[in-house]
């Protein structure tokens, strides 16, 4: 229905963003992994590559950072037993390049670790993923990179990203500060956020 939507990122919450385009606000489902990358672009112009899932009572828009990820999602949900929620969960867990590596290595265990994917489904998926995923990698370069503004500090970006996912500011500041202490000075936001979330989860499991 739409190839992409270009507009202002006006709102984010876990699993959802709103893009304003020509006076309309498009509610779009997206992976939390990508939403964390977008935190520094709130109230700025972005491009979202979209896929529409038509249901009996509604049309649901899913958004992706590249055409490659969108085509991967399209391929995933074509498999029996893999719906949009599970397809998005796979892309939330693995970047497209990582998913290609998993397919090449036939790492069924890694794929089966995704919520909603059991061992049998992972084994069935692996055959087609290994064959088809490499064709999508060139499309993965078609992203919204050219619309990114100059970055503020990773600390500020990280706090904004966690706040967008519902963490209180005080908790977000603590999580980012703890993660930064474990990484080199030149660590990127993409490296900091997974460490912050992992350490926070470990702390919750201990309590």
UniProtKB/Swiss-Prot annotation:
Q: Which GO terms describe its cellular component?
A: cytoplasm; Holliday junction helicase complex; Holliday junction resolvase complex
- Presence of keyword Chaperone: no
Q: Could you tell me which residues belong to the region Flexible linker?
A: 145-155
Please give the InterPro entries that the UniProt record associates with this protein. Answer: DNA_helicase_Holl-junc_RuvA_I, Hlx-hairpin-Hlx_DNA-bd_motif, NA-bd_OB-fold, RuvA, RuvA_2-like, RuvA_C, RuvA_C_sf
Which keywords are on file for this protein? Answer: Cytoplasm, DNA damage, DNA recombination, DNA repair, DNA-binding
Residues of the region (Domain I) are: 1-65
Do you know which Pfam families this protein is assigned to? HHH_5, RuvA_N
The molecular function GO annotations come to: ATP binding; four-way junction DNA binding; four-way junction helicase activity
> Per the annotation, which location comes first and is thus the protein's main one?
cytoplasm
The record's region (Domain III) falls at 155-207
- Localization annotation: Cytoplasm
Show the segment(s) annotated as Domain II.
Answer: 66-144
What the protein does comes down to: The RuvA-RuvB-RuvC complex processes Holliday junction (HJ) DNA during genetic recombination and DNA repair, while the RuvA-RuvB complex plays an important role in the rescue of blocked DNA replication forks via replication fork reversal (RFR). RuvA specifically binds to HJ cruciform DNA, conferring on it an open structure. The RuvB hexamer acts as an ATP-dependent pump, pulling dsDNA into and through the RuvAB complex. HJ branch migration allows RuvC to scan DNA until it finds its consensus sequence, where it cleaves and resolves the cruciform DNA.
The annotated subunit structure for this chain is: Homotetramer. Forms an RuvA(8)-RuvB(12)-Holliday junction (HJ) complex. HJ DNA is sandwiched between 2 RuvA tetramers; dsDNA enters through RuvA and exits via RuvB. An RuvB hexamer assembles on each DNA strand where it exits the tetramer. Each RuvB hexamer is contacted by two RuvA subunits (via domain III) on 2 adjacent RuvB subunits; this complex drives branch migration. In the full resolvosome a probable DNA-RuvA(4)-RuvB(12)-RuvC(2) complex forms which resolves the HJ.
What the entry says about domains is:
Has three domains with a flexible linker between the domains II and III and assumes an 'L' shape. Domain III is highly mobile and contacts RuvB.
Q: Which family does it belong to?
A: Belongs to the RuvA family.
Q: What is this protein called?
A: Holliday junction branch migration complex subunit RuvA
Recorded source organism is: Chlamydia felis (strain Fe/C-56) (Chlamydophila felis)
């Amino acid at each position: 229905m739409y190839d992409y939507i270009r507009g202002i990122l006006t709102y984010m919450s876990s699993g959802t963003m709103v893009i304003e385009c020509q006076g309309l606000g498009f509610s779009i489902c997206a992976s939390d992994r990508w939403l964390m990358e977008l935190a520094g672009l709130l109230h700025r112009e972005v491009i979202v590559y979209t896929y529409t899932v038509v249901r009996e009572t509604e049309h649901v828009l899913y958004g992706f950072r590249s055409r490659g990820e969108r085509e991967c999602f399209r391929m995933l949900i074509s498999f029996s037993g893999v719906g949009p929620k599970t397809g998005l969960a796979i892309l939330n867990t693995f970047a497209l390049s990582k998913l290609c590596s998993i397919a090449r290595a036939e790492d069924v265990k890694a794929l089966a670790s995704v919520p909603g994917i059991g061992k049998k489904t992972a084994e069935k998926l692996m055959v087609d993923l290994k064959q088809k995923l490499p064709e999508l990698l060139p499309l993965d370069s078609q992203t919204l990179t050219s619309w990114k503004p100059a970055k503020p500090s990773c600390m500020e970006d990280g706090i904004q990203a966690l706040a967008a996912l519902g963490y209180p500011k005080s908790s977000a500041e603590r999580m980012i500060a703890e993660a930064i202490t474990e990484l080199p000075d030149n660590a990127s936001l993409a490296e900091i956020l997974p460490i912050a979330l992992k350490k926070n989860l470990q702390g919750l499991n201990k309590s």
